[in-house]
From Swiss-Prot:
It comes from Shewanella violacea (strain JCM 10179 / CIP 106290 / LMG 19151 / DSS12). This is Small ribosomal subunit protein uS13. Part of the 30S ribosomal subunit. Forms a loose heterodimer with protein S19. Forms two bridges to the 50S subunit in the 70S ribosome. The keyword tRNA-binding applies. The keyword Transcription does not apply. Keywords: Ribonucleoprotein, Ribosomal protein, RNA-binding, rRNA-binding, tRNA-binding. One of its GO terms (cellular component) is cytosol. The lineage of its organism: Bacteria, Pseudomonadati, Pseudomonadota, Gammaproteobacteria, Alteromonadales. NCBIfam families: uS13_bact (TIGR03631). GO terms for biological process: translation. GO terms for molecular function: rRNA binding; structural constituent of ribosome; tRNA binding. Residues 94-118 are annotated as: Disordered. It holds the Pfam family Ribosomal_S13.
Length: 118
C-alpha cells in the first residue's frame, strides 16, 4: 500500500478512486491531480513506480487535506459560533442552517423525539 498524506492508499484500485480516499480530495480534484502529473486515471496504484507515487505525493501536498482541512472546517464553525451570527446560533443549537423547515422535519439534525411531559 502506498502512503499519501498520511493515508494508506489501496493498491488494487484505480488512481482516481484511490485518491478519493483522502479527506478533501473528490473525483474532480483527483482527476485534476492525475492530469497535472500526467498519470493515467485508470492505472492501478500497484502499477505505478515509486517516482510516480512521489509525484502524486507532491501534487496532493499542494492542497489542504486530511487533518489540516478538518481543523480549518472546525475553526470556521467555531468562528461563526463565537460571532453569534445566525449560522453560529443554529450550529450551537444543532439545527439546520440553510432555511429548512423544522416544525415537522429535521429529525436527523435534532435527534430522536423527546416525549412530552405532563
Amino acid at each position: 500500500m502506498a502512503r499519501i498524506a498520511g493515508i494508506n492508499i489501496p493498491d488494487q484500485k484505480h488512481t482516481v478512486i484511490a485518491l478519493t480516499g483522502i479527506f478533501g480530495i473528490g473525483r474532480t480534484r483527483a482527476r485534476a491531480i492525475c492530469a497535472a502529473t500526467s498519470i493515467a486515471e485508470d492505472a492501478k496504484i500497484k502499477e505505478l513506480s515509486e517516482a510516480q507515487i512521489d509525484i502524486l505525493r507532491e501534487a496532493v501536498a499542494e492542497y489542504t487535506v486530511e487533518g489540516d482541512l478538518r481543523r480549518e472546517v472546525s475553526m470556521n464553525i467555531k468562528r461563526l459560533m463565537d460571532l453569534g451570527c445566525y449560522r453560529g446560533i443554529r450550529h450551537r443549537r444543532s439545527l439546520p442552517l440553510r432555511g429548512q423547515r423544522t416544525k415537522t422535519n429535521a429529525r436527523t439534525r435534532k435527534g430522536p423525539r423527546k416525549p412530552i411531559r405532563k
